[in-house]
């Protein structure tokens, strides 16, 4: 049976958006789609963080969701956090249209992202290839512009 989830992104900045998730089979890929507005043109890191806690804004969401204790990487890398979804690309109008599939995240089981926080960052994620310690943890993606807790949808 297909599972669906949704995340409404908000923050202290004008950045906001809605991201949808759908997984047709429990061990199948997750389709991710939606849009984010209010961004500066270019790439912005896009990650699932460990906690669904937004009491202190996006900072209380903790580090990237990483149940396998791996180093940070890109979405197509073998070595990556479960929550490493790479970058979204905003056009001149400040809008990022999101549409991709990911086979590492899940909407159920040990790698479930339900109840965790999705974050869009101020800078591009270097996908762990930045040549310093921070790159292997965060991808040097900078501050957290907007976030939201991923919840079950109809």
From Swiss-Prot:
Where Cu cation is bound, by residue? 47, 49, 64, 121
Q: What Enzyme Commission number does this protein have?
A: 1.15.1.1
Mention one GO molecular function: superoxide dismutase activity
Per its Swiss-Prot or TrEMBL entry, what cofactor is needed? Cu cation; Zn(2+)
Q: Which GO terms describe its cellular component?
A: cytoplasm; cytoplasmic vesicle; cytosol; dendrite cytoplasm; mitochondrion; neuronal cell body; nucleus; peroxisome
Q: What is its main location?
A: cytoplasm
Q: Which residues carry this modification: N-acetylalanine?
A: 2
Q: Sorted alphabetically, which Gene3D superfamilies does this protein's record hold?
A: Superoxide dismutase, copper/zinc binding domain
Q: Where is the lipid attached (S-palmitoyl cysteine)?
A: 7
Q: Does the keyword Disulfide bond apply?
A: yes
| Catalytic reactions of this protein | 2 superoxide + 2 H(+) = H2O2 + O2
Give the originating organism. Answer: Macaca mulatta (Rhesus macaque)
The entry's function note states: Destroys radicals which are normally produced within the cells and which are toxic to biological systems.
Q: Which N-terminal residues, if any, form the signal peptide?
A: none
Protein name, per record = Superoxide dismutase [Cu-Zn]
Which InterPro entries does the annotation name?
SOD-like_Cu/Zn_dom_sf, SOD_Cu/Zn_/chaperone, SOD_Cu/Zn_BS, SOD_Cu_Zn_dom
Q: Which family does it belong to?
A: Belongs to the Cu-Zn superoxide dismutase family.
A Gene Ontology biological process term: locomotory behavior
Q: Where in the cell is it found?
A: Cytoplasm; Nucleus
Which cysteines does the record link by disulfide bonds? 58-147
Q: Which residues carry this modification: N6-acetyllysine?
A: 123, 137
Binding, Zn(2+): 64, 72, 81, 84
Asked if the record carries the keyword Secreted, the reply is: no
Q: Which residues carry this modification: Phosphoserine?
A: 99, 103, 106, 108
- Modification after translation (UniProt): Palmitoylation helps nuclear targeting and decreases catalytic activity.
